[in-house]
Amino acid sequence: MWMHKKILLKLSGESLKGESSYGIDPRTIKKIAWEIKEIKDLGVKIAIIVGAGNLWRGRTGEELGMDRSQADYMGMLGTIMNSLALQDALEQTNTITRVMTAFPVSSVAEPYIRRKAIRHLEKDRVVILGAGAGSPYFSTDTAAALRAAELNIDVILMAKNNIEGVYNKDPKKHQDAVLIKHMKHQQILSQRLAVMDITAASLCLENNIDILVFNMLKKGNIKKVVLKEGNIGTVISSKGE
């Protein structure tokens, strides 16, 4: 079977809130867990990074006049909360998981150690990576690119909410926006497209890591992108094809 065999799934925090305005929606996180289990049962090695936008937004810190580092650490703690929630949802599907965090939270998770994370993947455990990159000023997109490089991941699957992929302009503001099916990493940098931040895009370019941006809210899309079916989303690669 032709498929991606080792993936990093990047979930936004918003993907966990479903139709709610805040927090974690039980039905949504269970649905995501079952879709992850489905690809896990195909033999795919899976690492996951979750954002925290459902619990904390950087702009809230700005509105409060908070120090940027303080606000970023709050976001990192939010990703740990989401990681634990996703771990529980996955384990309800009888999927073996490990949560590893970029800074120690020893009561609830393992510290991130590269060689240990690789070993967990080799043992077919789903590895959920919390606390982003562990330092302020680095987004969870950058953390995803960093961990993908460290763990020799084939592709980063960037799951979006009701957005089919990368467009030539904002589809929420422009009805004539066109979906781009294939592009190069360099286009993100040169055109400053809002796919991921520049640091993350640069890391992917330097380490030749492919990115696939897709709409995760359509049932079965995670499996389809893993199996390379249906020509879904936008593929970003060094070749642009």
Curated annotation (Swiss-Prot):
Gene3D superfamilies: Acetylglutamate kinase-like. ATP binds at residues 10-13, 53, 57, 161, 167, 170. UMP binds at residues 72, 133-140. The keyword Ribonucleoprotein does not apply. It is found in: Cytoplasm. Inhibited by UTP. Transmembrane segments: none annotated. It catalyses: UMP + ATP = UDP + ADP. Keywords: ATP-binding, Cytoplasm, Kinase, Nucleotide-binding, Pyrimidine biosynthesis, Transferase. One of its GO terms (molecular function) is ATP binding. Coiled coil: none annotated. Pathway: Pyrimidine metabolism; CTP biosynthesis via de novo pathway; UDP from UMP (UMPK route): step 1/1. Homohexamer. PANTHER family: URIDYLATE KINASE (PTHR42833), URIDYLATE KINASE PUMPKIN, CHLOROPLASTIC (PTHR42833:SF4). Catalyzes the reversible phosphorylation of UMP to UDP. This is Uridylate kinase. It comes from Onion yellows phytoplasma (strain OY-M).
